[in-house]
A protein has these predicted regions:
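Structural/interface elements that position substrates and couple domains in central-metabolism enzymes
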Residues: 1-200
Length: 200
């Protein structure tokens, strides 16, 4: 589905292999060659949206590349968290699967070696992250995020995966490909009217 940057153990490796094979065979593949730069641009767009909120306390909901796994390989949100930490933002990360795997040492060595700066800010306590943050960044479609808007009605929410198809939200709700609007029928009608009068 269209949206935020991809990650995981397969797509990054497969796209690199296809680029290498095409290069070795002298085949021009502009679409395949554009995949990685486009993916990096999606990360930058996410960072820009988060920074546009003007808040310094950021809660990241989900660190693994998809819901229901503790797999951190090539997870794009790690790059986003790194960039925000480097700019002095206060980051808290909720990911129950990663937090549990840290405790059981499944991911402990990987995190210690590759992500030492993230150690200590990852938790399995969703409410503590949401309460302490001014901006909540939803990075995967975990079922536990469904109640976040209702429980925290005045937080800025950056939804990178379109967790909610429709939402009537009092706070600021924005996604990476659907603009700074609340996803409710009145706002959708306004967006359609605005697009009809826009010259491309």
């Amino acid at each position: 589905k269209p949206g935020f940057a991809y990650g995981g153990s397969c797509l990054p490796k497969d796209s690199k292999a296809l680029r290498t094979l095409a290069h070795d065979l002298y085949v021009d593949c502009p679409v395949i060659n554009a995949i990685n730069p486009s993916n990096e641009l999606q990360k930058k767009n996410a960072i820009d949206i988060i920074e546009s909120k003007g808040k310094r306390k950021i809660g990241i909901l989900g660190l693994s590349f998809k819901a229901g796994t503790d797999d951190l390989r090539c997870s794009p949100i790690i790059d986003v968290a790194d960039a925000l930490l480097g700019k002095g933002y206060e980051i808290k990360i909720y990911d129950k699967n990663v937090a549990i795997s840290q405790k059981t040492n499944t991911n402990a060595d990987f995190i210690a070696a590759k992500l030492p700066h993230l150690h200590g800010i990852i938790t399995d306590d969703l409410d503590s992250v949401c309460s302490a943050s001014d901006v909540l960044v939803i990075t995967n479609k975990g079922k536990e995020f469904a109640d976040v808007p209702a429980k925290y009605p005045h937080k800025a929410i950056v939804d990178l995966v379109r967790q909610f198809q429709t939402i009537d939200y009092e706070g600021n709700y924005e996604g990476i490909s659907w603009g700074n609007i609340n996803q409710n029928p009145a706002q959708n009608d306004k967006l359609v009217r605005d697009m009809a009068t826009t010259e491309f």
